[in-house]
Amino acid sequence: MEIEIQTKPFGKMQISEKQILSFPEGLLGFEDYKKFALIEEEEESVFKWLQSVEEVDLAFVVIPPSLFKKEYKPLISEQELQGIGITDLEDGLMLVIVTVPGEDPALMTANMQGPILINKKTLLGKQFISRNESHSVREKILASAAVEMD
């Protein structure tokens, strides 16, 4: 069944109810918002939008971290993973929130310390805190991608 949602980047749009992700604990700093939709801007784009279904002004640019940091593996316990019904990181869709500074998009950063993991079967999601202290909340995406390409 299709429902209409209001989005920050695209205005009104129709999405399938099956596109709605449930975050029982919300996202860090936004614990009151539990329902989100993952929206693709364009099919070719690596960036997606994680849009709150409950609050139009709450939307995050997200990207799979493997696109610019191939060896990224956050430290998350099996017990934490079981909270969304998965047993291994590979069983979920992993995303990180991207911050794009208006003055210079080339300086965009990703929150590698707080990855989002989504159970692809149940659409349950959670934002975790990686216990790997080498992960930054402001990892420069283009700098990391350039190093990965060397």
From Swiss-Prot:
One cellular component term from this protein's GO annotations in UniProt: cytoplasm
One GO process term, biological-process aspect: bacterial-type flagellum assembly
Subcellular location as annotated: Cytoplasm
Xref: Pfam families: FliW
SUPFAM superfamilies for this protein: BH3618-like
Keyword Chaperone appears in the UniProt entry: yes
Predominant location category: cytoplasm
Keyword list, A-Z: Bacterial flagellum biogenesis, Chaperone, Cytoplasm, Translation regulation
InterPro entries given in the database record: Flagellar_assembly_factor_FliW, Flagellar_assmbl_FliW_dom_sf
PANTHER family, per database record: FLAGELLAR ASSEMBLY FACTOR FLIW (PTHR39190:SF1)
Subunit description: Interacts with translational regulator CsrA and flagellin(s).
Family: Belongs to the FliW family.
Protein name: Flagellar assembly factor FliW
Source organism per UniProt: Leptospira borgpetersenii serovar Hardjo-bovis (strain JB197)
Gene that encodes it: fliW
